Every structure is written in C-alpha cells, then in structure tokens.
Design a protein with these regions (language model features):
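Acidic, amphipathic alpha-helical patches
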Residues: 3, 52-53, 129
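Conserved phosphate/ATP/ADP-binding segment of small-molecule kinases
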Residues: 31-35, 42-119
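A short acidic, amphipathic alpha-helical/loop segment
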Residues: 21-29, 51-55, 155
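Alpha-helix C-terminal capping segments
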Residues: 5-8, 24-31, 93-95, 182-183
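Short beta->alpha connector loops
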Residues: 17-22, 42-46
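Short, acidic/turn-prone active-site loops that include or flank metal/cofactor-
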Residues: 40-44, 125-127
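Conserved phosphate-binding/catalytic loop of the ribokinase/pfkB sugar-kinase fold
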Residues: 1-21
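Conserved phosphate-binding/catalytic region of the ribokinase-like
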Residues: 81-202
Length: 202
C-alpha cells in the first residue's frame, strides 16, 4: 500500500477496481489536496460496505460506478428511471465526490456536478464495436488525463468517450497500447460537434 513519493506529485490519481481496504490505505497516503478518481470494484460496491465507502469517498473527487454497480449499491432496480437515478447520484455525491459519473455502456454516461446541481447525459461516440473489454477503463483514464490537463469536465468526458470508442474497436490490450499518436485527437475533432449537439441536461 505504498506509493513512491515522486508519484504523489501527480496532478491526478485514478484507482481502477481494487478491494476496499487496500484502496482506502492507498488513498490515505496521498496529499490532502490530491485530485482522486475512483472506479469501484464490483465485488465491494454493495450496501453492506456503505460505512467504509463513506469514509473513502470523503477524499474522492470523482467516482465512476457502472450502472450495474450503482443500482446494486443503492439496492434499486436496474431500469433507467432517471428521477430515481438522479436522487441516488446526489446521495452518492453527498458522501464527498463533487463529480459523479454513472457509466451507462452503449448509452454513454450521466455526469453529475454537485456545485451546479446539474446532470448531463454524455452520449457514446462508438462507431464499430469489436470487444467491450477495457472500454470503461479507457473512458476513465481519458477523462482524468484531459481534465487535469486543463479541459473543462464536459470536454474531458467527450474525450473519455473518444478513448472508449477506440478501445471498442480493438481486440486486445496490446492493440490498445499501440494506438498511433494523434488518432484520438483526430477523432475528437471529427466527432466533437455532433456529440455536443446530443448532450442533454437532465
């Protein structure tokens, strides 16, 4: 549960799914003002762990559950009931994170900004789906990188969708690690306007 001191100077930290207790230990080693993004582990994001999550989420800037994880955590039906989802996204944000991103698979994502008390529906920009493995991870990583690099959160989320769309077209992790430089930015420029037109305030 140790993070090298040099790493602690990073502009942001993303925690992919980890068991609950190592996750808490790692987060507690980071500076108080660190920008921390957490993608919950599906085996640990359940109501019985709520107290532990409340302690963890006090330190978290962005939490990004999948729809399945989110509905299990709040013990609500997996059915797109936007009013019910909004209620529980606010509840999740009240535990600490000013930003909640609900990953919705082919439907894209719902983004909640606590400071504005506003929900945005961010559509997917997938063009050709070969393998869904890693698409959510690419979304999370792209969103974090672009946000801490200076983009506003909506632009960062669109770039997250672009990263996800590229991963969806590949058949292996090796392909994902060898995407040519500039491919993502070229796609972003091509799809940005059409994606922004489809973004809705919920």
């Amino acid at each position: 549960s140790e993070i090298p001191e040099g790493f602690k100077e990073a502009r942001g930290f993303h925690f992919s799914p980890l068991p609950l207790y190592p996750l808490a230990e790692l987060i507690n080693t980071l500076p108080e003002d660190a920008w921390i993004q957490v993608d919950p582990h599906y085996e640990w994001f359940f109501p019985e762990y709520r107290e532990e999550w409340e302690r963890i989420l006090r330190r978290v800037s962005v939490v990004l559950p999948s729809e399945d994880e989110f509905t299990k955590f709040f013990d609500i039906p997996l059915a797109f009931d936007i009013d019910n989802y909004k209620k529980h996204m606010r509840e999740l944000s009240a535990m600490g994170p000013p930003i909640v991103v609900l990953k919705m698979g082919p439907q894209g994502a719902i983004l909640y900004l606590k400071d504005e008390d506003v929900f945005y529906s961010i559509p997917s920009c997938a063009e050709h789906v070969v393998d869904v493995t890693g698409a959510g991870d690419s979304f999370c990583g792209s969103l974090l990188y672009n946000y801490v690099s200076g983009d506003d959160i909506i632009t960062a989320a669109i770039k997250g969708m672009v990263g996800s769309s590229i991963t969806l077209e590949n058949t292996s992790a090796d392909e994902n690690f060898h995407v040519a430089e500039g491919v993502a930015m070229e796609r972003f420029r091509r799809v940005e306007a059409s994606v922004r037109e489809k973004i809705k305030i919920l």
